[in-house]
């Protein structure tokens, strides 16, 4: 028996995740683990103006506000600075004192994932082929009920009756007795018909 499996045209699996998730990778060049804390400022115009005036225009990014209306709701990261070309973010409040590109500085890399789509396409087919041998069918017949094979010229006392038509023969309780007598009667008629035709 041979079995071959080949899967065909299964529907493609696609899933979309629309979330704004940020994952931070911490680099420990100086042996210290760096984390970034969030500082939430009260939503009033005075605090917002003070914060915006303390930063240069190129340092202000989307992370400075949590909504489209900064006066209503906005969040401030305590050490927010612009990202350098080497994808490192300096943890210092001043970028001029210690640039993030120097070796030995603590750096944190942020990666933002939005609208992630996962597509998995599986093209295959299923085919099953079986080869059944005769040996198996023979075994199935052996498992069934078996009857003894009777030869035409058998001398066994279990199956052959004597020549007399009496019920007191050797095979008085034989289950083939009726069939045997019916067959013998037909054979006699055939023999008599052949003699008459000759």
UniProtKB/Swiss-Prot annotation:
Residues 17-30 have a biased composition (Low complexity). Residues 17-36, 53-73, 129-167 are annotated as: Disordered. Its cofactor is Mg(2+). GO terms for cellular component: host cell cytoplasm. Residues 64-73 have a biased composition (Polar residues). InterPro entries: Rotavirus_A/C_NSP5. One of its GO terms (biological process) is viral genome replication. The keyword Phosphoprotein applies. O-glycosylated. Hyperphosphorylated on serine residues, when in dimeric form. Phosphorylation by host CK1 is required for the hyperphosphorylation of NSP5 dimer. It is found in: Host cytoplasm. Keywords: Glycoprotein, Host cytoplasm, Magnesium, Metal-binding, Nucleotide-binding, Phosphoprotein, RNA-binding. Signal peptide: none annotated. Homodimer. Interacts with VP1. Interacts with VP2. Interacts with NSP2; this interaction leads to up-regulation of NSP5 hyperphosphorylation and formation of virus factories. Interacts with NSP6. Participates in the selective exclusion of host proteins from stress granules (SG) and P bodies (PB). Also participates in the sequestration of these remodeled organelles in viral factories. Plays an essential role in the viral genome replication. Participates, together with NSP2, in the formation of viral factories (viroplasms), which are large inclusions in the host cytoplasm where replication intermediates are assembled and viral RNA replication takes place. Orchestrates the recruitment of viroplasmic proteins such as capsid proteins to these factories. Participates in the selective exclusion of host proteins from stress granules (SG) and P bodies (PB). Also participates in the sequestration of these remodeled organelles in viral factories. Belongs to the rotavirus NSP5 family. This is Non-structural protein 5.
């Amino acid at each position: 028996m041979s079995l071959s499996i080949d899967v065909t045209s299964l529907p493609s699996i696609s899933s979309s995740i629309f979330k704004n998730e940020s994952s931070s990778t911490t680099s420990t060049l100086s042996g210290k683990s760096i984390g970034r804390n969030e500082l939430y400022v009260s939503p009033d115009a005075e605090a917002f103006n003070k914060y915006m005036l303390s930063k240069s225009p190129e340092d202000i990014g989307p992370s400075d506000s949590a909504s489209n209306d900064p006066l209503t709701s906005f969040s401030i990261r305590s050490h927010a600075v612009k990202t350098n070309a080497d994808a490192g973010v300096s943890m210092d409040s001043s970028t001029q004192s210690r640039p993030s590109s120097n070796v030995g500085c603590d750096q944190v890399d942020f990666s933002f994932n939005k609208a992630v789509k996962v597509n998995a396409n599986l093209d295959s087919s299923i085919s099953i082929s079986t080869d059944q041998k005769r040996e198996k069918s023979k075994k199935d017949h052996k498992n069934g009920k078996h009857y003894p094979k009777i030869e035409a010229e058998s001398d066994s006392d279990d199956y052959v009756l004597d020549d007399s038509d009496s019920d007191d023969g050797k095979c008085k309780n034989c289950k083939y007795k009726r069939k045997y007598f019916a067959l013998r009667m037909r054979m006699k008629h055939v023999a008599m018909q052949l003699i008459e035709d000759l």
